[in-house]
Amino acid sequence: MAPNIRKSHPLLKMINNSLIDLPAPSNISAWWNFGSLLAICLVTQILTGLLLAMHYTADTSLAFSSVAHTCRDV
């Protein structure tokens, strides 16, 4: 039987130990996984909100060009 490359290759071994064979307790519930997904969504929304806020102009004469710039270039 050939050794598993996932457990013998140095780089794949590091990825395997941290992501695939996760060193986590076996009694983690589905709520823990759901909460981590919610945290990822929250961080994504905060980062995209900050990105859009940096490209927004509140001046009435520049408002349309600001939205057009956001739709075109961001």
Swiss-Prot record:
First-listed, main subcellular location of the protein, grouped into a coarse class: mitochondrion
The membrane topology term of the UniProt record is: Multi-pass membrane protein
List this protein's GO terms for biological process.
mitochondrial electron transport, ubiquinol to cytochrome c
Q: Which UniProt keywords apply?
A: Electron transport, Heme, Iron, Membrane, Metal-binding, Mitochondrion, Mitochondrion inner membrane, Respiratory chain, Transmembrane, Transmembrane helix, Transport, Ubiquinone
Annotated cofactor note: Binds 2 heme groups non-covalently.
- Give the protein's cofactors: heme
Which molecular function GO terms apply here? metal ion binding; ubiquinol-cytochrome-c reductase activity
Sequence intervals crossing the membrane: 34-54
Superkingdom of source: Eukaryota
User: What's its job?
Assistant: Component of the ubiquinol-cytochrome c reductase complex (complex III or cytochrome b-c1 complex) that is part of the mitochondrial respiratory chain. The b-c1 complex mediates electron transfer from ubiquinol to cytochrome c. Contributes to the generation of a proton gradient across the mitochondrial membrane that is then used for ATP synthesis.
Q: How does it assemble?
A: The cytochrome bc1 complex contains 11 subunits: 3 respiratory subunits (MT-CYB, CYC1 and UQCRFS1), 2 core proteins (UQCRC1 and UQCRC2) and 6 low-molecular weight proteins (UQCRH/QCR6, UQCRB/QCR7, UQCRQ/QCR8, UQCR10/QCR9, UQCR11/QCR10 and a cleavage product of UQCRFS1). This cytochrome bc1 complex then forms a dimer.
Q: Which family does it belong to?
A: Belongs to the cytochrome b family.
Do you know which PANTHER family this protein is assigned to? CYTOCHROME B
Give the protein name, as stated in the record.
Cytochrome b
Instruction: Look up and give the organism this protein is from.
Output: Anser caerulescens
**Gene responsible for this protein:** MT-CYB
